[in-house]
Amino acid sequence: MLDPKLLRSDLPLVAERLARRGFTLDTARLEALESRRRELQTETERLQNERNTRSKAIGQAKASGEDIQPLLDEVSDLGERLDAAKARLAEVQAEWDESVAALPNLPHDSVPQGLDEADNVELHRWGTPGTFDFEVRDHVDLGAKFGYLDFEMAAKLTGSRFAVMRGPIARLHRALAQFMLDKQTREHGYEECYVPYIVNDASLTGTGQLPKFGEDLFKLEGDHDFYLIPTAEVPLTNIAREQIFTPAELPLKLTAHTPCFRSEAGAYGRDTRGMIRQHQFDKVEMVQIVDPATSYDALESMRGHAEAILQALELPYRVVTLCAGDMGFGAAKTYDLEVWLPSQETYREISSISNCEDFQARRMQARMRHPEQKKPQLVHTLNGSGLAVGRCLLAVLENCQQADGSIVIPEVLRGYMDGVERINA
């Protein structure tokens, strides 16, 4: 959520920065709501003061033996008018809050100008895409050849955009997740967490999925407002909700391996083949809760933590800085890591690392207090994939395929697979 003080003090600046995202801010509506809010606030305070004055007069009149009924009637009337003014003020405030909750984060000054992925800026590439002297198969054909990756069975069990993995491919998928967790905890200093895969609406509001993106979520039926998590970012980041940290407790670095569930409501017809876009997929998530003064250093570190996974697996990739118009709702700056897929002869997203600054923290009231400060300040929150396990699996299958259809297991994963070096057809 954006800073209400900034919205009230410099709305044109907010509108200008949001325009970089391609977002048109209805300044007239916000100005009208704020004007009405101030009027009602003033009226409420006036009526409150007037009622207090009349209430005191009742005691004085009673002590002097005067008829207090007219004063009682006046106080009663003032009370009714005050209640009505408070109700109108609450309605206007709720309308203001709803409008502000729908506003995306402001892009950082270093974010490139642009409206979509065509305007993203490549930072660098690592590794050289391999050359093959045979016809390259995609992960769907490779899985069908093995019989260990079955989309037809998944469609029978559930529907489209699901997968059944068996045997060595299921084991390779698990090995990837374990390797990622070990890398993030042992080398990069994250604390491993086990979190609920079901969260409430307050958690999703805290990280920004609600109220605007409810259609992208799987909501459970029942008396509670429960949802399947779209990413472990939601429970991990909300660990900081309504907390006040000391400087010594930060940075808080958390990681978790979870399934993620997304309706993909806006992805009809896109990436319908294979594991690129699934309703259920696994991901190792990284979250950092940090002092605002260090958040952009943390962003660079997190990018390195994600890159280290791809480098260890020897998978070619590139890093891009997302332009303002292509960033997620809560992000102030985002890097995407894109892995090379030989079957598509292009790079595809495998990790997104974002600094949300205080956007989520304001919603969650996640704060810190320096010893020299009287009031606590909002922390900054960052999140990123370290990495998407399913997409990493298909990248390994495609980049490590051999002419005979076998898959060479990356060396760093062999210890997780009892020394197996190759998956044979």
UniProtKB/Swiss-Prot annotation:
Annotated GO biological processes are: selenocysteine biosynthetic process; seryl-tRNA aminoacylation
Kindly state which reaction or reactions the protein catalyses: tRNA(Ser) + L-serine + ATP = L-seryl-tRNA(Ser) + AMP + diphosphate + H(+); tRNA(Sec) + L-serine + ATP = L-seryl-tRNA(Sec) + AMP + diphosphate + H(+)
List locations, semicolon-separated.
Cytoplasm
Family indicated by similarity: Belongs to the class-II aminoacyl-tRNA synthetase family. Type-1 seryl-tRNA synthetase subfamily.
| Quaternary structure annotation from Swiss-Prot or TrEMBL | Homodimer. The tRNA molecule binds across the dimer.
Q: What does this protein do?
A: Catalyzes the attachment of serine to tRNA(Ser). Is also able to aminoacylate tRNA(Sec) with serine, to form the misacylated tRNA L-seryl-tRNA(Sec), which will be further converted into selenocysteinyl-tRNA(Sec).
Protein's recorded name: Serine--tRNA ligase
Q: Native species of this protein?
A: Chromohalobacter salexigens (strain ATCC BAA-138 / DSM 3043 / CIP 106854 / NCIMB 13768 / 1H11)
Q: Give the taxonomic lineage as stored in the record.
A: Bacteria, Pseudomonadati, Pseudomonadota, Gammaproteobacteria, Oceanospirillales
Quote the gene name from the UniProt entry. Answer: serS
